[in-house]
Amino acid sequence: MGSLISEILTWLTNMGYAGIAIGLMIEIIPSEIVLAYGGYMVSEGTIGFIGAIIAGVIGGTIAQIFIYWIGRYGGRPFLDKYGKYLLIKKHHIDMSENWFQKYGAGVVFSARFIPVVRHAISIPAGIARMPFLKFVVLTVLAIIPWSILFVYLGIQLGSQWDDVENIAGTYTTPIMILAVVVIALYFVIKKRTAIFKR
């Protein structure tokens, strides 16, 4: 774990629940690490499990709402020009746009569990002017299990919480596979529904 990340996490620790939310909002540190550290704080009795989950969901959702609004009001030209300053890469935007166009709004939920497009998927949702409430609901529903998983892992790892990156694949790979299956099923159902309506 880099010294800079450790310093930031130490600073966030002093803020308790707000620190977890802020850590996820600014996205300087991967959400998995912030949530795992939150789990470590739970294991130390500094904060409560439910509170850590709520803070994670609030912080993660606000971060995605911010990206959604950028997509909605800034559009692709703004992101092509300034996306690098927001740590959003052009090929990530391209991939998420393709997914959104192919699978529709449901991908906002399932893509949250897939690396690369997990954060970028909010951009095409904003550009397409997806209903805001629908976007928030799907985002929250996806962030809840993600937060629970990594806070739990942080609790189990205790003082070795920073090993979460090494073991996360054991848990996230099945989730990613399931997410891809969900996307495929959603697409098939949507296509068949369209055929029956003809």
Swiss-Prot record:
Organism name: Bacillus subtilis (strain 168)
According to its record, how does it sit in the membrane?
Answer: Multi-pass membrane protein
Its job:
Flippase that catalyzes the transport of undecaprenyl phosphate (UndP) across the cytoplasmic membrane, from the external side to the cytoplasmic side. Is involved in UndP recycling during peptidoglycan synthesis.
* Traits of the deletion mutant: Deletion of the gene increases sensitivity to the amphomycin derivative MX2401, which binds UndP in the outer leaflet of the cytoplasmic membrane and prevents its recycling. Deletion of the gene sensitizes B.subtilis to reduced levels of UndP synthesis. The double mutant uptA-ykoX exhibits increased sensitivity to the amphomycin derivative MX2401, but has no discernible growth or morphological defects.
User: Per the record's keyword annotation, is Mitochondrion included, yes or no?
Assistant: no
| TM region positions | 15-35, 47-67, 107-127, 135-155, 169-189
Any idea what this protein is called?
Undecaprenyl phosphate transporter A
User: One Pfam match, by short name?
Assistant: VTT_dom
Family, per entry: Belongs to the DedA family.
Where is the protein localized?
Cell membrane
The highest taxon in the source lineage is Bacteria
